[in-house]
Design a protein with these regions (language model features):
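Short beta-strand elements bearing conserved aromatic residues within extracellular beta-rich modules
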Residues: 91-93, 123
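Short proline/glycine-enriched turn/loop motifs at strand-loop junctions of beta-rich domains
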Residues: 84-90, 118
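The feature marks proteins involved in alpha-glucan
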Residues: 2-76, 80, 99, 105-168
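Extended, well-structured beta-strand/loop surface patches
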Residues: 96
Length: 168
């Protein structure tokens, strides 16, 4: 995305992100999924360029995620797995040889409702995201940042219910 200086001036004046601002700047959430750079030019020639840190913007755009339960939650014997990845293009759960697509909510949380048979299985999240340093979309295979259990080598998360004694 390219933006002009008028857009930047008005956007930088905003100190909080509320619904009115989201309506006024509807493309900001999409812009954050790709490369963002600020370039200074003189006489049409670029003289400086830098990337942009977006962490604070994400917190402002997705305040509802603060109250979400992330990681594994249980509804009886059924697990629900949730991951906050607001800039991801796609997220899936690697469960053995299966790759299961997660659904993105408006607050940037990706969710997958599981099955009772998943208890005790190892998993990884596959997160497709644009990486500025390599200028392309890459798939990161990661353990769950909210893991309550890991495999012995710590290479995968485990779907575990710590309230069930036989899981220990």
């Amino acid at each position: 995305y390219a933006v002009n200086s008028d857009f930047l001036r008005s956007a930088l004046k905003a100190v909080k992100n509320d619904n009115a601002q989201k309506e006024y700047y509807p493309t900001v959430a999409d812009i954050l999924k790709g490369p963002i750079q600020i370039r200074a030019s003189h006489g049409g020639v670029a003289v400086a360029q830098t990337g942009v840190q977006i962490a604070g913007v994400l917190d402002s755009l997705y305040p509802g995620a603060v109250n979400r339960d992330l990681g594994i939650t249980w509804h009886g014997a059924i697990p629900t797995l949730s991951l906050w990845a607001p800039t991801a293009i796609r997220v899936s759960l690697q469960l053995g040889t299966r790759q299961l697509a997660a659904e993105r909510d408006d607050d940037g949380v990706w969710t997958l409702h599981g099955e009772e048979s998943w208890k005790g299985l190892a998993y990884l999240w596959n997160v497709d995201v644009f990486v500025p340093s390599v200028h392309k979309v890459v798939t990161n295979r990661v353990t769950d940042p909210y893991s309550v259990a890991l495999t012995t080598d710590s290479k995968q998360s485990v779907i575990a219910d710590l309230t069930v004694p036989e899981m220990y």
